[in-house]
Structures are given as C-alpha cells and as structure tokens.
C-alpha cells in the first residue's frame, strides 16, 4: 500500500502540526549538537585543553562542510514541501534522487581540496603550533569520510518533508547514543585521543545513513529510490541550490566569522581563550539548535500552505514558531547571566578556562532573547521560497555587523571586544529582520485585500 500523501499539513490545527513536526526536529537538532558536545567533553577531560583548542580550530571547517550539506539538504527539503503542496509528486521524487547525486559530487570535491591543503587551512583557521597536530588528526578522519556526513544531513532533512519527522529524530538520537558509547572506547580504552573521537562520529553517522537509505528504498514510500531519478536535472538543481543558497551563504559566512573569531581569540588571549571560545560556542549552539529544530518543524508546514495559497495558516505557524523560539533564547539568556560556570565545567576542570568561558558566555547572551525571532524570520522567508530575503538576512548579521565588530572592537576593548562583537551583531540584525517581516506581511495583506 502506498504511503499516504501528507495533506494533514494543510488541514490539521497549526499548533498540533507544529508540535508534531517541531518536537522531533528539536530532539534531532539537539541530538546533532550533542555529537560535538560529547566529543569535546571527552577530549577536554581525557586528552587536554590543547586538544580542545585544536578542536576549536576545526570549527570553520565544520561550518564550511555544513554549508555545502545545507545548500543541498535544506534546498531540497523546501522544494519537496512546496511540490507536495502542489500535488506535483513526480518532481518531488526526482528531487530525492538529485539530492543524493549532488551530495556525492560536492562531498567528494570538498574532501579532495581540503585534504590537499589541510595544514595551511588549519593555520589560517587559528591553529597554533601547539594545537595544529590535534586539529590535523581530527580533520584527516572527518574529511576522509565527508561524503557520508553530507549525505546523512541532506537525506535526514528530506525525511521530515516526506512525512517522517519522528523517524528522522529517532535515527539522530540513535546516532548520538552510538557516538557517546564509542567515544570512551576509542578515546580512553584504545588510547586513540582526538582521532578516536572523529572515528566514533563517522561510525555513528554511517549507521544512521544506512538506515535512511533503507527506508527510502521501500517502494511503499511516496518518495523512494528508483532508477531514473539520479540524473541531474537543470531545473531541479537550479531551484534546489537557489533556495539552499541562503543556508550555504550563512554557513560560509559563519566559517569566515569563526575564522576571524579564532584568530582574534588566539591573538588577544592565546590557546586558553581559543579553548574557552570553543566551550561557549558549544553551549550557545544547543539553544540555537532548538530554534533550528523549530524552524525545521515550521518549514514543511509553511511551504505546503504557501504552495496551497492558505496564507492565514502560513502567518499562524510563523507566529507560533517565533513565540516558541523567543522562549528558548530567554532560557539561554538566563543560563548565561546566572549560571555560566555550570555548563562550562562539562568540558574541562581547568578553572582558568572555566572562568574565561563563563565571562565570555555572559557577554554573548546579552541580546539572546531577541535572537530566536531573528533566526525564525530568516528561515521563514526560505521556507516560502523567498531566497533573496533569506540570503540578505543571513548575510547581514555576519558580513555587515559581526565581521566589522570583530575587526574594530578588540582594538579598544581587547579580548572583551571579541566577545562583545557577537551581541552587537545580534542587535543590529534583529532590527533588519523585524523591518523586512513587517514589509512582507503588509505587502501580502494588501494583495489579498485588492483581490477581495
């Protein structure tokens, strides 16, 4: 029996839909962030703070890899959601096959280029003479199996659009549990250090990818693997990459930003500051991933109803998502203000680094209550196919505000200036997002009134 078309996206109450789609996505995103947290916690406690600094130097690599994965995965997810809303099932099927092909091509090219120039790239990304060996060991493993990571992230996103949010969540959770079980084995028992953490991550992602491919190989699925869908089609590739360009540019800019942050931390605070930034990044990442999970829950709902011209439901899911995201970032703000040392100790017992991380976290969350809404607005435009606005919002925080902040503020405030550049950029980008959303709502409602 063929899988039921997910028409519930246009029929069920928005609150129930968002809960059904967002909760699994949130758990999946938090679980995904736990891959890095588990690795860093074991590395910080059992390998040392220099290894933790080396791992921080790999952050730009992770952002760049995520950029290519998101360009294909998020773009394909949006195209599939809209096509399902339009009842265009043949195109949705072809998008699935094209996603696999694109991930194989881009993942392979990324691996070849980065492995060829690995040491110079890591030095540019902020690795010092003492942290470079650790960063190199980790990235050699991660890059060698990069195609697996790309394919896993892309197909996991498509599972949600295809009506399997709970399965997507379950596979991610299973992957994290496997990773958490393998980390002590490879890092401590087999004494493989930071290389063992990378191997554990790759094994866990490989198992999750195999399960996803098994699910999509079933002919009972509305979207399933079959001959004829893997050959790249220009129209699908164009639309997928155009919509995926927003997260690609956002992650690419994040790569540049983290590069500058790493180098500034190294310049103004040394290896300890670099390790402290890695801790702060990991803590804040959890809250951001919860917001991203809300966005992933919103995406198929907004995309389907936009394609079905049910604008009231589109605005409703946006309001619900923004409210939930703001609640999440308020919790992050309170954590950073009142108990920043507690999460920092997950990663290290070095009191100097814990103190530096707590101080930096407290500064970073100054504007956090507003950040959730800004992120939701950017992904909302992406969900309804308005790639240009989404790209602009993604770039405004990184290029227009954050990079100048990183370059200017430390000259006057030293290491604190590096930390303060982040809430400064958040405040400015929130103003831009609110303005664009106000204009979009007004524009659509005026069109609806003219048709009435």
Task: Identify the residue ranges that each predicted region occupies.
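Residue-level hotspots within pore-lining transmembrane alpha-helices
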Residues: 31, 35, 65-69, 109, ...
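Transmembrane helical elements of multi-pass membrane transporters/channels
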Residues: 20-39, 141, 175, 204-208, ...
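Residue-level signal for short hydrophobic patches within transmembrane helices
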Residues: 11, 15-34, 38, 61-68, ...
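Helix-terminus/linker motif at the lipid-water interface of multi-pass membrane proteins
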Residues: 34-53, 122-129, 185-192, 252-282, ...
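Membrane-helix interface/capping residues of multi-pass secondary transporters
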Residues: 40, 49-52, 89, 118, ...
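Short alpha-helical transmembrane segments in multi-pass integral membrane proteins
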Residues: 1-22, 80-147, 189-244, 302-367, ...
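Small-residue-rich hydrophobic transmembrane alpha-helices
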Residues: 52-112, 149-168, 276-334, 338-340, ...
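Short runs within selected transmembrane alpha-helices of multi-pass transporters and secretion channels
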Residues: 73, 141-160, 171-179, 197-210, ...
